[in-house]
Regions:
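Hydrophobic alpha-helical membrane-insertion segments
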Residues: 16, 22-24, 101-110, 169-184
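Transmembrane alpha-helix boundary and packing residues in multipass membrane permease domains
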Residues: 66, 70, 114, 118, ...
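Alpha-helix N-cap/start motif
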Residues: 91-92, 163
């Protein structure tokens, strides 16, 4: 697994993908937080990180599939996937190595936004008038969300040899998992089932963590979704051995 992880992460670094992803994420979030009037912290009149944690998931929804779309699709198209599968590596070594390298890149893109937190902290009146617990909970949620999107992207890449198709499938699945169930639950036809339906979606658990209360049920939900997507990837990858 370590070999695959190092190979994938070095590929990111050598192809400039890592630098592009981090730059695009920080620039996009920076513009939303400090420049664009409708979302700027400076126009809110109070210190708040809501822009990052509300719009960040939608930025990641496109950015992460762009990272993961090549992970299996490129190897399938080049015919190197069979060579990879013949090496003394288990399917899980390959899957986890690729997943962890992608997730690490996402984390490295998110961590520099702590600079924005420091800026907002200093802008508070008085300085420090920020819901730090909520911010930390939101960061945990955003990092776990990045892991879910990475696992979705990896699965999408495993079912096709076309990177563009992989990207489109991943964006669609991420969007459905993030907002789909919440939108479905808002339709006034489900009655008492609407609450249950809402809890199936990512945004319900993500918003719960943003309140600063790290409930084990929310954490279990995220990891369950990650495991599910990696299991589906394992099934697809395993089918190529037969």
């Amino acid at each position: 697994m370590l070999h695959v992880f190092q190979k994938e992460f070095n590929t990111f670094l050598n192809s400039l993908i890592a630098y592009i992803v981090i730059s695009v994420f920080l620039t996009g979030i920076g513009l939303l937080m400090w420049v664009f009037p409708e979302t700027s912290v400076l126009d809110y009149g109070y210190a708040d990180m809501q822009t990052l944690f509300t719009l960040g998931p939608f930025v990641l929804m496109f950015l992460i599939p762009a990272i993961t779309m090549r992970m299996f699709a490129e190897e399938k198209k080049a015919g190197t996937i069979e060579l990879l599968l013949t090496k003394p590596l288990t399917d899980w070594d390959i899957i986890l190595g690729k997943f962890l390298s992608g997730w690490l890149l996402v984390i490295l893109a998110i961590l520099p936004t702590l600079i924005y937190y420091v800026s907002v902290y200093m802008l508070g009146n008085p300085p420090g008038n920020v819901d730090t617990a909520g911010v930390m909970g939101s960061y945990v949620g955003l990092i776990l969300l990045g892991a879910v999107f990475t696992s979705v992207g990896l699965f999408s890449s495993s079912i096709t040899n076309n990177q563009i198709v992989s990207f489109i499938i991943a964006v669609f699945l991420c969007f459905i998992l993030y907002t789909g169930f919440d939108s479905l639950a808002s339709i006034n036809v489900w009655g008492e089932w609407s609450s249950w339906l809402e809890q199936l979606g990512i945004i319900y658990h993500y918003n719960a963590m943003s309140r600063g209360l790290l409930d084990t049920r929310d954490i279990i939900y995220f990891f369950s979704l990650i495991v599910l997507m990696l299991l589906l990837t394992r099934i697809i990858l395993g089918s190529r051995r037969w």
